[in-house]
């Protein structure tokens, strides 16, 4: 049963699914679509051609689908699509896109914490966590299963690869390769996101191949392109390694981040099920 509080404003034309809850003083504009089981909490504001996926909760004072903060925007018809079972927390802002027919998209099962900002033409994958005050400029692409710590600023057109973990208070100016962990301003790669991969049940052999890939690409002294080719020869049967190489070879407006934290440990993982430390 849908429950809309009398003080909420839901404009004619808005599409409201089954079992939707809209709390006091929330505002839902005419072109919005709320799928089944969505909860819109008090004072939230949802505008534009915005679709909120099933089971997602929009927390108080979040703003979604409003005009992009981009001087190039001329009133074109653009879209926001938020997936299923997301949590968009207090005061988060997700603006609409720029240029006719384009979309700001967020995948399923994402947690967007308070005061995060996702700008025009961004795309965010599934199972992503943005901590408080994460700020994405326009055209940023974030892969699946990425975690970004508090107060991180991301330059426009940057790509952040799947399973990456970005430490708090970092400044991101270049593309972050998938499966990596790092921090800092300027940013420095610390190695492979070993703990994150283990939590996601990535097999031990895959994690080991990724660690050896990281060492070869960033610490061997080989040229960047030569090292990408050599890891494909040695570990090309591992899908995650192929994905890493493909990401690094894709066209990029910002370039790949290659700064390294030389003090970071690149020891191979210890896996309780696999036994003791594995030497390289």
From Swiss-Prot:
The keyword Acyltransferase applies. It is an enzyme of class 2 (transferase). This is Acyl-[acyl-carrier-protein]--UDP-N-acetylglucosamine O-acyltransferase. It comes from the Bacteria. Keywords: Acyltransferase, Cytoplasm, Lipid A biosynthesis, Lipid biosynthesis, Lipid metabolism, Repeat, Transferase. Signal peptide: none annotated. Involved in the biosynthesis of lipid A, a phosphorylated glycolipid that anchors the lipopolysaccharide to the outer membrane of the cell. Its EC number is 2.3.1.129. Its main location: cytoplasm. It catalyses: a (3R)-hydroxyacyl-[ACP] + UDP-N-acetyl-alpha-D-glucosamine = a UDP-3-O-[(3R)-3-hydroxyacyl]-N-acetyl-alpha-D-glucosamine + holo-[ACP]. One of its GO terms (molecular function) is acyl-[acyl-carrier-protein]-UDP-N-acetylglucosamine O-acyltransferase activity. Pathway: Glycolipid biosynthesis; lipid IV(A) biosynthesis; lipid IV(A) from (3R)-3-hydroxytetradecanoyl-[acyl-carrier-protein] and UDP-N-acetyl-alpha-D-glucosamine: step 1/6. GO terms for biological process: lipid A biosynthetic process. It is found in: Cytoplasm. It comes from Chlamydia muridarum (strain MoPn / Nigg). InterPro entries: Acetyltransf_C, Acetyltransf_C_sf, Hexapep, Hexapep_transf_CS, Lipid_A_LpxA, Trimer_LpxA-like_sf. GO terms for cellular component: cytoplasm; membrane. The gene is lpxA. Belongs to the transferase hexapeptide repeat family. LpxA subfamily. Pfam families: Acetyltransf_11, Hexapep. Homotrimer. Disulfide bonds: none annotated. The keyword Transcription regulation does not apply.
